Regions:
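Conserved micro-motifs of the catalytic ATP-binding
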Residues: 1-4
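Short helix-loop "hinge" at the ATP-lid/N-box region of the Bergerat-fold HATPase_c
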Residues: 20-21
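Short beta-strand/loop element within the Bergerat-fold HATPase_c
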Residues: 28-39
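Acidic ATP/Mg2+-coordinating residue in the GHKL
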Residues: 48
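Short conserved segment of the HATPase_c
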Residues: 53-65
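Short alpha-helical Gxxx[C/S/T] motif in the catalytic ATP-binding
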Residues: 78, 82
Length: 114
């Protein structure tokens, strides 16, 4: 179990799921958690089989106002806000992706963060 700011963590997860839904017309979205190599941490992930993000996009994905395209709604702030929240929870967020195959966002946070 996690002892953390549940409201903020839920905000992060909701944003990641909404982003996955925005870029996954066909396929699936998976949400879950897994043990970390360090037993003091947990990893939460949102994975999709959507369009994927280019290497260039990955380099900028957490920058404020960055959008991978100009066709979708949003101001390009969501992932930047997610990163700020995760860092305040003393965690990290990272992304792996392959164009045409999908994307996985992973949040690694300590089990106890008050």
């Amino acid at each position: 179990y996690l002892v953390t700011d549940n409201v903020r963590l839920q905000q992060v997860v909701n944003n990641l799921i909404n982003n996955a839904a925005k870029f996954t017309t066909y396929g699936s979205i998976t949400f879950g958690y897994e043990e970390d190599e360090d037993p003091e941490y947990t990893r939460i992930f949102v994975e999709d089989t959507g369009v994927g993000i280019s290497e260039e996009g990955i380099r900028h994905i957490f920058e404020r106002f960055y959008k991978v395209d100009n066709f979708t709604q949003g101001a390009g702030l969501g992932l930047s806000i997610c990163q700020t929240i995760v860092e305040r929870l003393r965690g990290t967020i990272f992304v792996t992706s392959e164009v045409g195959r999908g994307t996985r966002f992973t949040v690694r946070i300590p089990n106890f963060c008050e």
